[in-house]
């Protein structure tokens, strides 16, 4: 199956936006929930699940379910290894050289208190420091993907979706918070803010739509609902920017739009916007050459994804020695964004150069012949 250029571009854009979101740059105004009450995290999880569902279905049809299951687990293992290498570098950098800086102490507080316990917790994905908490969620969901497809084979996708929605519903009463309270003070457990009981609904939905896409089935709802979804997307967009321009919005701060537990209105906003985006993505092929660097960033997302996390960890310290407060604030706001964006874009440019390299000798030979 041919790679989906549109999704590669989308993942590249999401990665660059995520770099800015994890910085203190003023550009966050335009990258942090710019299209409504959802962030790049929801998009990243959903798009990744969509591709996982598509690829699992393709492998299962061509090589059998066992081969698809093995490939899915193998990929999850590779991503887990990349995450652990990234985390290990952050531990070494922060623990050996930068532990006296407040920013590093905030990021790696549990690790600095009990290093061996934190390392053990990281291996089993129970220790997830800030800025490095979304990949463990992705890894866990990837390991569970074969189980979701096995359940769908046995009982059908309706049952799987209903079960997933039920878990999400239970998550709205903050069951996870009770578990965190029970393990409070345990040095090797730092689960991060994401409620996996809620976020699994995005993953299961992405798997479901990915396998439908592979089978050529319709992904969009009934045509009669299309105007309603568009109107819903515009309404949330206006609401979001109104809350930014005119100040605090009390409703936006309630559980209905909660990010970590995926409040119901937040889900409605995301899926409505996803419908609109799906209708627009097909037009990206018209600018394939122009958007090629972004598509290559998205195609090589795993190695690129790990680099901004390392840079954000390191950029908490360089400007904190011997500078006045104004210069200090300027450095802290620009370093993460500049470093992260640079190390995200460079692989795309390098890959683009490699893509055009095979044509160079041919052009040169023709010139010599003339």
What are these regions (language model features)?
Residues 1-370:
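Alpha-helical transmembrane segments and their immediate juxtamembrane cytosolic regions
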């Amino acid at each position: 199956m041919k790679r989906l250029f549109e999704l590669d571009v989308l993942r590249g854009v999401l990665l660059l936006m995520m770099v800015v979101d994890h910085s203190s740059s003023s550009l966050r105004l335009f990258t942090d929930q710019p299209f409504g009450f959802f962030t790049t995290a929801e998009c990243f999880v959903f798009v990744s699940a969509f591709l996982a569902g598509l690829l699992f279905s393709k492998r299962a049809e061509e090589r059998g379910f066992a081969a698809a299951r093995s490939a899915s687990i193998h990929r999850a293992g590779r991503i887990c290894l990349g995450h652990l290498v990234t985390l290990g570098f952050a531990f070494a950098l922060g623990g050996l050289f930068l532990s006296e800086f407040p920013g590093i102490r905030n990021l790696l507080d549990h690790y600095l208190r009990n290093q061996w316990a934190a390392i053990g917790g990281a291996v089993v994905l129970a220790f997830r420091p800030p800025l490095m908490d979304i990949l463990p969620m992705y890894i866990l969901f990837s390991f569970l993907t074969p189980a979701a497809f096995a359940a769908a084979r046995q009982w059908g996708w309706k049952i799987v979706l209903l079960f997933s929605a039920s878990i999400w519903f239970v998550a709205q009463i903050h069951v996870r918070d009770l578990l965190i309270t029970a393990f409070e003070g345990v040095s090797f457990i730092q689960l991060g803010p994401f409620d996996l009981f809620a976020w699994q609904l995005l993953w299961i939905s992405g798997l479901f739509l990915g396998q439908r896409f592979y089978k050529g089935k319709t992904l969009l709802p009934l045509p009669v609902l299309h105007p309603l979804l568009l109107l819903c997307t515009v309404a949330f967009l206006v609401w979001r920017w109104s809350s930014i321009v005119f100040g605090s919005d009390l409703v936006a701060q309630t559980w209905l739009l909660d990010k970590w537990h995926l409040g119901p209105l937040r889900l409605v906003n995301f899926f409505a916007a996803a419908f609109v985006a799906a209708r627009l993505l097909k037009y990206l092929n018209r600018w394939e050459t122009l958007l090629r660097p972004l598509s290559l960033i998205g195609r090589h997302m795993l190695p690129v994804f790990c680099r901004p996390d390392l840079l954000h960890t390191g950029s908490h310290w360089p400007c904190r020695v011997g500078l006045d407060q104004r210069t200090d604030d300027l450095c802290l706001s620009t370093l993460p964004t500049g470093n992260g964006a640079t190390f995200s874009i460079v692989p795309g440019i390098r890959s683009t150069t490699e893509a055009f390299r095979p044509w160079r000798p041919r052009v040169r030979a023709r010139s010599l012949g003339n």
